[in-house]
Amino acid sequence: MSVVLRHDWDRKELQALFDLPFPELLHRAASVHRAHFDPAQVQVSTLLSVKTGGCPEDCAYCPQAQRYDTGVSAQKLMETEEVVAKARQAKAAGASRFCMGAAWRSPKERDIPKVAAMIREVKAMGLETCATLGMLDAGQARALKDAGLDYYNHNLDTAPDYYDSIIHTRQYQDRLNTLEHVRDVGLKTCCGGIVGMGETREHRIGLLLALATLPAHPDSVPINQLVQVPGTPLHGTQQLDPFEFVRMIAVARIAMPKSMVRLSAGRETMSDELQALCFLAGANSIFYGEKLLTTGNPDTERDQALFQRLGLRPMQVTVDAAEHDHPGTVHAEITRSAACEHAA
């Protein structure tokens, strides 16, 4: 199947995809997926909160916002040795990428060298590195790149026209500016959003439209299902129809055919059957481990059993930590010939 990488999607086109009969949408998404990836391989990441709680923002979904009574207390930035120990455990459990998250609006200058040390140590273990630290300026993005960071996560969260219903302390343009800084220094981007926050299908289309018309598609697109935490304003929101969630995955795959589409937060309450539909629809990345920052995630044994039932295997990567001209060069051990073989 010939797939053209596009950045000129319009709302009507994405609406038409969402409106397709469910079997037809999954067929199209699976065909696009097979054109670029081995459908039996799933990239596995582990996420660690290296600085928890005390965030001054007001994101309505977030238990780490200090203004909400969620039982999450503010903690100091972890020591590098603690982070390395967690990364070692993640690698032993099968993760190929280690993501470090901090509950900051944006990092202070004194924090960047500490995070850079974490990145260097984790990279030396042969893991891909990812960080999500809030808003970055150009200099901070460069410092993280120079430390060997591979990916920076900064989500758009939702559609531009629904954003003010969720967040008031940061503008949509602030998020776009951070993504621009990250791209400009050559970091790979991890950028997606959250569904099930009371938005309409039109808002979900708006989120995908914003992502698919960025100057460069995100390398990873996490699709999160809202995890409702008592004490946050969104606790008690009506649950999203599971088939609508699968449609979100499928349209993301079609609109951004070469991106990794990550089945992200919310998996703990998803059935194996729902997750299988998501993999069929084009999801090819997950967070692996019992916790995502402060919320639950399926334990590793459950994921291993699911992979075995579905015949899936973790995508293997090799990281060249000694590459000086291009620190953090990553080679996924997945070949175009393998992808074509499964597409045949």
UniProtKB/Swiss-Prot annotation:
InterPro entries (alphabetical): Aldolase_TIM, BATS_dom, Biotin_synth/BioAB, Biotin_synthase, Elp3/MiaA/NifB-like_rSAM, rSAM
Coiled coil (residue ranges): none
Cofactor: [4Fe-4S] cluster; [2Fe-2S] cluster
UniProt keyword Flavoprotein, yes or no: no
SMART domains to which the protein is assigned, alphabetical: BATS, Elp3
Xref: PANTHER family: BIOTIN SYNTHASE, BIOTIN SYNTHASE, MITOCHONDRIAL
Enzyme Commission (EC) number: 2.8.1.6
NCBIfam families documented for this protein: bioB
Binding-site residues, [2Fe-2S] cluster: C99, C130, C190, R262
Note on how the cofactor is bound: Binds 1 [4Fe-4S] cluster. The cluster is coordinated with 3 cysteines and an exchangeable S-adenosyl-L-methionine. Binds 1 [2Fe-2S] cluster. The cluster is coordinated with 3 cysteines and 1 arginine.
UniProt family annotation: Belongs to the radical SAM superfamily. Biotin synthase family.
Gene giving rise to this polypeptide: bioB
Role summary: Catalyzes the conversion of dethiobiotin (DTB) to biotin by the insertion of a sulfur atom into dethiobiotin via a radical-based mechanism.
Molecular function via GO: 2 iron, 2 sulfur cluster binding; 4 iron, 4 sulfur cluster binding; biotin synthase activity; iron ion binding
Subunit structure: Homodimer.
UniProt-annotated binding residues for [4Fe-4S] cluster: C55, C59, C62
Protein name, per record: Biotin synthase
Pathway as given in its UniProt record: Cofactor biosynthesis; biotin biosynthesis; biotin from 7,8-diaminononanoate: step 2/2
Organism: Xanthomonas axonopodis pv. citri (strain 306)
Entry-linked SUPFAM superfamilies: Radical SAM enzymes
Keywords: 2Fe-2S, 4Fe-4S, Biotin biosynthesis, Iron, Iron-sulfur, Metal-binding, S-adenosyl-L-methionine, Transferase
